[in-house]
């Protein structure tokens, strides 16, 4: 099934707007209102340019077969497994955090209608949601199949946006009593919170790059002029949502804001619906994390399988020098074609990731996510470290590297100005990604 631009926009927007949208007002606390808005715009521009670069470099592999693995192997085959591992860890960690959110909110939601201790147990709620909703959606092979789920999730985000705006425009007396000091410029920095603590919220608010190649592969055309519309629309909408929720939430509570804004609203029908909306959002977002994680795990397993085959072939060819070189050259070229051809999730029509492999990897992700989610109530620090490494790698470092190394290589003489701009913007994104990785790791390790 060929995907449309609209379904691509919905999928990308849904991937970007996860549960982190609830923390956007909190991100303003050490920055102040105006610097906070500037950070949202700056990080949005960086994310959009990174997605544009992904759209540009997709042409360097056969149409419908673009992926991080295929492109990484064009630059340096040895780096492929490193970035596949980063994607798998990042997506798995975010998926687990979604289930932890379900475990935190579902008992609060159910308490409105029942006092049954079994139904108010967080592990029971995680089990039910995983079994009846998350697992079936995670077995879908194409992102386009999740377009209706994405529509529901985006509707949930829209409701949250309206809820935050309404409470800002017409606050209750209880909310007014919670209001703290508002800073329009940088406020005085405190020991327990500074800009490094909330910087990752801005930087990773637009992380959706791990699904960009899947979306490109499912489009009827991979031409840049066609594909660029998807990140342009999706990131623009995300930017509007983040500014609306971030500004309204911060102006409502000032420096008394907390990490999950909806927890500050008094018990009411509107806030209960808001909690349900959050559960819908994260529940439907889990498959969007499972999708690239599954592909990356498959690539890692395939890498080791190919390595074993290569070692066996080398051992078999050792007796003669004449047969030692030519088979290895042929194997090398075949390996590259196989890598591009076997992009599991990124090429659904000709994927080897089906049957037993597809089921085993998907079940492993689901079971591991479930076990971690019911065992741990907070992954804040771990996810901060995973985000600083995995998210930065796939959002800035790797796309930037692709852009700088690949864009313009098709030109033998003069390189057009537009191509040069994309090429060197890739280098800037690569450097930006390294700076952000170091900064956010410092924040996660020393300031939390």
Swiss-Prot record:
Record has RNA-binding as a keyword: no
Residue intervals on the Cytoplasmic side: 1-7, 54-80, 147-150, 217-229, 289-357, 403-424
Keyword set, alphabetical order: Amino-acid transport, Membrane, Phosphoprotein, Transmembrane, Transmembrane helix, Transport, Vacuole
Residues bearing PTM Phosphoserine: 344
Topology Vacuolar: residue spans: 29-32, 102-125, 172-195, 251-267, 379-381, 446-448
Superkingdom of source: Eukaryota
Recorded GO CC terms: fungal-type vacuole; fungal-type vacuole membrane
Any GO MF annotation of the entry: L-glutamate transmembrane transporter activity
Chief localization: membrane
Ranges annotated as spanning the membrane: 8-28, 33-53, 81-101, 126-146, 151-171, 196-216, 230-250, 268-288, 358-378, 382-402, 425-445
GO biological process: amino acid transmembrane export from vacuole; amino acid transmembrane transport; transmembrane transport
Disulfide bonds: none
InterPro entries noted in UniProt: AA_transpt_TM
Localization: Vacuole membrane
Topological category with respect to the lipid bilayer: Multi-pass membrane protein
Family (UniProt): Belongs to the amino acid/polyamine transporter 2 family.
Job description of the protein: Involved in amino acid efflux from the vacuole to the cytoplasm. Capable of transporting aspartate and glutamate. Requires ATP for function.
Protein name: Vacuolar amino acid transporter 6
Source organism of the structure: Saccharomyces cerevisiae (strain ATCC 204508 / S288c)
């Amino acid at each position: 099934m060929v995907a449309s631009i609209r379904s691509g926009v919905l999928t990308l927007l849904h991937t970007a707007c996860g549960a982190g949208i609830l923390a956007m007002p909190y991100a303003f606390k050490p920055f102040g209102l105006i610097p906070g808005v500037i950070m949202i715009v700056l990080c949005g521009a960086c994310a959009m340019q990174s997605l544009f670069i992904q759209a540009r470099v997709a042409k360097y592999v056969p149409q419908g077969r673009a992926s991080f693995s295929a492109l990484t192997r064009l630059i340096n085959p040895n780096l492929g497994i490193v970035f596949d591992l980063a994607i798998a860890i990042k997506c798995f960690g975010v998926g687990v955090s979604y289930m932890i959110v379900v475990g935190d909110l579902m008992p609060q939601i159910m308490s409105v209608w029942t006092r049954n201790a079994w139904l108010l147990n967080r592990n029971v709620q995680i089990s039910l949601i995983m079994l009846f909703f998350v697992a079936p959606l995670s077995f879908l092979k194409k992102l386009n199949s999740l377009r209706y789920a994405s529509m529901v999730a985006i509707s949930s985000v829209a409701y949250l946006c309206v809820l935050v705006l309404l409470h800002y425009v017409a606050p209750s007396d209880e909310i007014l009593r919670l209001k703290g000091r508002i800073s329009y410029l940088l406020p005085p920095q405190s020991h327990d919170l500074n800009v490094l603590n909330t910087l990752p919220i801005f930087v990773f608010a637009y992380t959706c790059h791990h699904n960009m190649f899947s979306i490109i592969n499912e489009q009827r055309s991979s031409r840049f002029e066609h594909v660029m519309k998807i990140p342009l629309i999706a990131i623009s909408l995300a930017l509007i949502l983040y500014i609306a929720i971030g500004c309204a939430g911060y102006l409502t509570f000032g420096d008394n804001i907390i990490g999950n804004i909806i927890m500050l609203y008094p018990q009411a029908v509107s806030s209960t619906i808001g909690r349900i909306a959050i559960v819908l959002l994260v529940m439907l977002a889990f498959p969007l994390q499972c999708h690239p994680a599954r592909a990356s795990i498959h690539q890692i397993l395939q890498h080791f399988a190919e390595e074993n085959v290569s070692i066996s072939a080398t051992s078999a060819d050792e007796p003669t020098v004449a047969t030692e070189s030519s088979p290895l050259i042929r194997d090398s070229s075949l390996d590259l074609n196989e890598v591009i051809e076997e992009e599991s999730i990124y090429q659904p029509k000709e994927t080897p990731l089906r049957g037993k492999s597809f089921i085993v990897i998907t079940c492993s992700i689901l079971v591991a996510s479930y076990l971690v989610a019911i065992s741990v109530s907070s992954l804040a620090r771990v996810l901060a470290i995973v985000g600083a490494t995995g998210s930065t790698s796939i959002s800035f470092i790797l796309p930037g590297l692709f852009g700088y190394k690949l864009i313009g290589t098709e030109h033998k003489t003069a390189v057009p100005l537009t191509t040069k701009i994309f090429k060197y913007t890739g280098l800037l994104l690569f450097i930006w990604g390294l700076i952000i990785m170091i900064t956010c790791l410092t924040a996660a390790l020393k300031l939390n």
